[in-house]
C-alpha cells in the first residue's frame, strides 16, 4: 500500500501510517504473507530524497510490520530491497530490518533528522477515508 506523504515526512508520520493505515488494512485483509518493498531512499540524508526517515524510524517500522506478520500470517514476511543512494544509509537501514526480523542485535546508528517534520495528520486522515478506516 502506498501512502502519498509530503516532503519532509519522517519518523512521526510513517509511524502514524503504520498504526492508523497499515495495521487496519492488514487486520481487514487478513493476508497469508506480507511482502515489504524497503526503500532506504526515504532516509533524510539520501542524496535524492525529500523525505525524512531516520535509521531508528526504519527499525520501528520494520518491527511493526514483523509484529503484524506474527499476528496475522504466522510470521510469514518477505523484505525486498528497493532503493537508497547513500551506501551508509542503505547499510544501516538493512541492519535495522535484519534486527527487526530476527530480534537479535541492536541498531548502532543514531541519525535523527535535523529538519522539522511537517504535520501529516490531515493527509493520513484523507487516506483512511479512501480506504474506509
What is each residue range found by the language model?
Residues 1-133:
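A general "terminal functional-core" signal
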